[in-house]
């Protein structure tokens, strides 16, 4: 295959992005120019989002035809929408990847780095696991996928605090400090009827999270397993020590499972990648590893 040949795996590249993000117009124009210069036979489509959740609709529509490479230029939340859009398509040959343009980009940090044009030219793809969360309660059932992590308690409260407090290292640090001071434990009921109180519960498909540091020694998001990082209810100093250890030494090896289930005893916030959702009391929560569910480069 010649250096300018387009690998047959993709019939087009689709760029999905938020046009209102600062500098995005210039970045998309530059990216499109770079792709076409390296791969002149490539068809590039640009799909700007118009509202929250729109990326999911755009990805679903694009994934239903042909063999597209969907590139989300976003943070973890934007990429989550694209991934869920692809999973909404009943049968698809779509391939996904992300270019960082957000606050966390935990998924991008945890994936091997390769030149985008080189990856497209080679056409080499790989399968990765997703986390599938099923919430069942009085309002019915909701199913959603996560590419990186699902967090309860501390993780979503940090996200809410940062959103209110503003972006930037100093503002984020102040927001996290305020969050710790107002953190309340949550209670879960396991399948055997036993209950437990936690300050934090993270189910991780990746080894690193921006606000936690290294949560696991393992970084193998294609083995049908995910890591369970728990912090039972304790004093604030325990939370501070856990956070300090995560950002310095790492939390070490964590238990790996293929599924994790419980019922909420009280309302709790939940963060699915970058999106915060509020889970009502008496909701049955089932998180499973969807092995090799997503094709990526």
Q: Language-model segments: what does each one mean?
A:
Residues 1-70, 80:
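ATP/NTP phosphate-donor binding region
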Residues 2-3, 195, 220-223, 230-297:
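ATP/nucleoside-binding phosphotransfer catalytic cores, i.e., glycine-rich phosphate-binding loops
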Residues 16, 49, 88-200:
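Catalytic core of DAGKc-family lipid kinases
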Residues 19, 73-75, 99-101:
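Glycine-rich beta-strand-to-loop/alpha-helix junction loops that act as flexible
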Residues 78-91:
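Short Gly/Thr/Asp-enriched flexible loops that form oxyanion-binding sites at enzyme active sites
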Residues 151, 202-217, 276:
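Glycine-rich phosphate/pyrophosphate-binding beta-alpha loops
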Residues 155-158, 197, 208-213, 236-239:
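Short acidic/glycine-rich loop or secondary-structure boundary segments that cap or lie
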Residues 164-173, 212-238:
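Gly/Ser/Thr-rich active-site loops/lids in small-molecule metabolic enzymes
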């Amino acid at each position: 295959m010649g250096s300018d040949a387009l690998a047959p795996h993709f019939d087009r590249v689709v760029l999905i992005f938020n046009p209102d993000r600062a500098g995005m117009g210039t970045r998309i124009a530059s990216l499109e120019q770079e792709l076409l210069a390296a791969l002149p036979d490539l068809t590039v489509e640009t799909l700007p989002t118009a509202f929250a959740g729109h990326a999911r609709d755009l990805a679903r529509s694009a994934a239903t035809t042909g063999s597209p490479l969907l590139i989300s230029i976003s943070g973890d939340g934007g990429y989550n929408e694209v991934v869920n859009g692809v999973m909404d398509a009943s049968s698809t040959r779509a391939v996904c990847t992300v270019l960082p343009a957000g606050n966390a980009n935990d998924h991008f940090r945890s994936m091997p780095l390769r030149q985008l044009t080189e990856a497209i030219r080679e056409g080499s793809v790989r399968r990765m696991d997703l986390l599938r969360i099923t919430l069942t309660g009085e309002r019915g059932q909701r199913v959603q996928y996560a590419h990186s992590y699902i967090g309860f308690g501390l993780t979503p409260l940090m996200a809410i605090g940062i959103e209110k407090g503003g972006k930037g290292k100093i503002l984020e640090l102040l927001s996290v400090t305020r969050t710790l001071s107002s953190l309340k434990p949550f209670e879960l009921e396991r399948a055997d009827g036993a209950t437990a109180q936690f300050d934090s519960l993270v189910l991780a498909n990746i080894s690193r999270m921006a606000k936690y540091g290294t949560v696991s020694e393992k970084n193998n998001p294609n083995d049908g397993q995910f890591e369970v990082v728990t912090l039972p209810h304790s004093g604030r100093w325990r939370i501070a020590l856990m956070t300090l250890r995560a950002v310095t030494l790492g939390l070490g090896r964590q238990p790996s499972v293929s599924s994790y289930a419980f019922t909420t005893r009280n309302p709790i916030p939940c963060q699915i990648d970058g999106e915060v959702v509020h889970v009502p009391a008496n909701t049955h929560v089932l998180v499973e590893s969807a092995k090799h569910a997503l094709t990526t480069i």
